[in-house]
């Protein structure tokens, strides 16, 4: 059912801890792993967990602005349904009853999916994305849709048509982007887990800014079916959470083969939570010199090295490695992403769905006015750049060279991983 952007409507009952006279963490503060154990042991109910998170949304949203749509009634009904199944002794997944927020470029049947854009302000998808089917099968409780940079183009969540999202640690700071709503919601306790999308850092960067864990999965491991496309060869849906194990839990739930996505890999995926228990001792960790040169903040460099030394102290071996084509990565990314965006966003023309301009004299003018009024400045900038690099006379000079650079970068990483367990960036 359609939900307009709004705050949670009613107050939450007394917290789970207050009812038990405990001075411990609130339910909304706990990890998915801890909550899953508590739910399985019937130490709390999914309704109680969901009420706790909804209460947190109600109290923090005026300050944070992470949500565009809150599905309060649907979430509580879903939580009650999971509690009923648990009471009957049905077999449930680790995610059953866990509240999850969804980035607003992932299609959700019956719930507005805006991509934080005026042009899709009232768009309600008639189908669920593949990852939503997986979450529903796992018994997750969907809280609502999260703010983002318009069409995932940005790095601060300030490019949303609806509102800016603030960093929960300091509202004067940005949460990063484009999955800023997804990261801020987890950091603020407004969701236990969230889904975001990552094209050029849109999960990893806001996760770092908000002090949580975020993963851009291996391309093809998570279906892109139902993800509104930005740059199809780079886009990937991924999990955000409070801990590595939480992220592994959500990743395990959403990965897998999907016949609707031609790039979806045909393979068996392990339970990624088991890998979290692996030993650090014996790992060979690459330290690429190109990532520690000019331009890096001294504080960031110190923090990254501190982690590397901690891993070394736990038995890992640090290995110097060179990835020389890294210097060209950002330029190649902007060319490829903008080129693909200009093609993907051509479908938003006011004919089949989305916003349509009110005034126009002919079909061509309708297209022009709809797109001029419907898209924000950053989206239009990238569409123009993409159209330029794909135009006659410039395709070989820009796009073709960028794709060649992409292949070189991939090969350098592939070669490095022949002798390394991981690369520390």
Locate each region found by the language model.
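Acyltransferase
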Residues: 46-51, 80-83, 296-322, 353-355, ...
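Acidic/His- and Gly-rich active-site-bordering loop/insert found
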Residues: 75-77, 85-160
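Short glycine/serine-rich loop segments
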Residues: 127-257
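A short helix-breaking turn/cap at a secondary-structure junction
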Residues: 216-307, 364-369
């Amino acid at each position: 059912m359609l939900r307009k952007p709004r705050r949670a409507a009613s107050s939450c009952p007394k917290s789970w801890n207050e009812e038990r006279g405990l001075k411990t963490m609130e339910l909304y503060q706990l990890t998915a792993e801890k909550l899953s154990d508590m739910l399985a042991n019937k130490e709390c109910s999914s309704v109680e967990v969901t009420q706790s998170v909804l209460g947190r949304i109600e109290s923090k949203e005026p300050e944070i602005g992470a949500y565009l749509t809150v599905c309060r009634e649907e979430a509580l009904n879903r939580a009650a349904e999971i509690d009923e199944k648990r009471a009957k002794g049905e077999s449930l997944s680790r995610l059953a009853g866990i509240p999850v927020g969804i980035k607003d470029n992932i299609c959700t049947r019956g719930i507005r999916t805006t991509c934080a854009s005026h042009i899709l302000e009232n768009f309600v998808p008639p189908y669920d994305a593949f990852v939503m089917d997986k979450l529903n099968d796992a018994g997750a409780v969907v809280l609502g849709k999260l703010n983002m940079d318009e069409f995932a183009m940005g790095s601060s969540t300030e490019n949303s048509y609806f509102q800016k999202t603030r960093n929960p640690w300091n509202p004067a700071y940005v949460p990063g982007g484009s999955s800023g709503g997804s990261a801020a919601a987890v950091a603020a306790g407004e969701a236990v887990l969230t889904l975001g999308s990552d094209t050029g850092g849109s999960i990893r960067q806001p996760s770092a800014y908000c002090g949580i864990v975020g993963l851009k999965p291996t391309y093809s491991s998570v279906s892109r079916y139902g993800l509104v496309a930005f740059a199809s060869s780079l886009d990937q849906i991924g999990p955000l959470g409070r801990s590595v194990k939480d992220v592994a839990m959500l990743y395990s739930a959403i990965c897998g083969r999907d016949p609707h996505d031609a790039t979806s890999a045909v393979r068996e995926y392990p339970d990624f939570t088991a890998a979290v228990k692996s030993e650090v001792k014996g790992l060979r960790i690459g330290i690429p010199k190109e990532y520690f040169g000019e331009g890096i903040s001294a504080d960031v460099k110190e923090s990254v090295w501190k982690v590397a030394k901690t891993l070394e102290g736990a038995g890992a071996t640090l290995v110097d490695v060179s990835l020389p084509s890294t210097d060209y990565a950002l330029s190649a990314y902007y060319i490829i992403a903008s080129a693909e965006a200009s093609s993907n966003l051509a479908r938003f023309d006011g004919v089949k769905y989305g916003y349509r301009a009110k005034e126009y004299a002919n079909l061509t003018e309708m297209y022009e006015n709809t797109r001029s009024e419907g898209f924000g400045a950053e989206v239009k900038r990238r569409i123009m750049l993409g159209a330029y690099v794909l135009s006659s006379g410039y395709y070989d000079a820009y796009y073709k060279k960028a794709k060649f650079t992409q292949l070189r970068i991939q090969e350098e990483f592939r070669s490095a991983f022949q002798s390394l367990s991981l690369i520390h960036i």
